[in-house]
Amino acid sequence: MGLGRVLLFLAVAFPFAPPAAAAEPHSLRYNLMVLSQDGSVQSGFLAEGHLDGQPFLRYDRQKRRAKPQGQWAENVLGAKTWDTETEDLTENGQDLRRTLTHIKDQKGGLHSLQEIRVCEIHEDSSTRGSRHFYYDGELFLSQNLETQESTVPQSSRAQTLAMNVTNFWKEDAMKTKTHYRAMQADCLQKLQRYLKSGVAIRRTVPPMVNVTCSEVSEGNITVTCRASSFYPRNITLTWRQDGVSLSHNTQQWGDVLPDGNGTYQTWVATRIRQGEEQRFTCYMEHSGNHGTHPVPSGKALVLQSQRTDFPYVSAAMPCFVIIIILCVPCCKKKTSAAEGPELVSLQVLDQHPVGTGDHRDAAQLGFQPLMSATGSTGSTEGT
């Protein structure tokens, strides 16, 4: 797996998606991946499950069994849960392997087919469900489970892959509208059952907000407002001058990234004239709480300027970790070809919410849906 493949996986891992201001729905998400080597589909699969954004399940490839992820899932969910999950994941993994077999543009080397299946229950009790398919880390098809409406990115490769796969599904008498609705209903039943068990108790962790400054040329200052260690993921972070939010094109937002401990981090930066620090504040809103944070001035400004604490550093670290995670198994593949390639871990992909359903959700995944204009901006500004 070369650098291009790694970058594709990173694109999936870090979708450019500005979070919505509304409360997050309850969600259940499964992430499955199968591999082929030189045209031959490998046995086994890798799968993980997330409940309300938190890992609760991992498929043990050696024991061929779903196992709890985290002490909280192990304590609350009984043995019957893992029997049911094992049976369902095994069936889904076999179905994904059959689909990979029928992708006709496979060439030599290692290739992957990944499915992310999501169902949600919103505050108004409405439900949504979808599946998203990736070949070699590139999204090529999104499907609404309720309406069976499909969204395909603009690239010719994605169009070809989507047509190939959907034609294969049409040949399967089991792939009917009733089948897809039953798929969504099963996911929603599990989600409701897990919520009733108390395993997905909502928690709120307020962000830690830090404002730093760095001097630039001609008397301008770059001020950066960083929020970290917060949960849930939705947050509004923006700069204000004299109490009024700055225009969108005068600010730069970072993506909302995982901190690695189940919480998130993000930042927003802008440039101001030195000496006008007192006119600017960073406004933060999270889970109904809000606050303003002033720009440090005087000695504090000098001290902050001497630091190299800038948002691009923290944003680059998770990417570096992911490259290591993805590249190490690739090195193993080259040295142990006789044993077959190891499956690439999906944990880094599962740390990010994936929308369900329509064209907007495909855009939130970081890819352009068919017949749609460019959408997301990577902003953490509230909508």
Curated annotation (Swiss-Prot):
PANTHER family: MHC CLASS I POLYPEPTIDE-RELATED SEQUENCE A-RELATED (PTHR16675:SF154), MHC CLASS I-RELATED (PTHR16675). Its main location: membrane. Glycans are attached at residues 164, 210, 220, 261. This is MHC class I polypeptide-related sequence B. GO terms for molecular function: natural killer cell lectin-like receptor binding. Keywords: Adaptive immunity, Cell membrane, Cytolysis, Disulfide bond, Glycoprotein, Host-virus interaction, Immunity, Immunoglobulin domain, Membrane, Signal, Transmembrane, Transmembrane helix. The chain crosses the membrane at residues 310-330. The keyword Ribosomal protein does not apply. SUPFAM superfamilies: Immunoglobulin, MHC antigen-recognition domain. It is found in: Cell membrane. GO terms for biological process: adaptive immune response; gamma-delta T cell activation; immune response; immune response-activating cell surface receptor signaling pathway; killing of cells of another organism; negative regulation of defense response to virus by host; response to heat; response to oxidative stress. Residues 23-309 are extracellular. Belongs to the MHC class I family. MIC subfamily. It is linked to Rheumatoid arthritis: An inflammatory disease with autoimmune features and a complex genetic component. It primarily affects the joints and is characterized by inflammatory changes in the synovial membranes and articular structures, widespread fibrinoid degeneration of the collagen fibers in mesenchymal tissues, and by atrophy and rarefaction of bony structures. Proteolytically cleaved and released from the cell surface of tumor cells. Induction: By heat shock, oxidative stress, retinoic acid, IFN-alpha and the DNA methyltransferase inhibitor 5-aza-2'-deoxycytidine. Induction by IFN-alpha is impaired in patients with chronic hepatitis C virus infection. Down-regulated by human cytomegalovirus UL112 microRNA during viral infection which leads to decreased binding of KLRK1/NKG2D and reduced killing by natural killer cells.
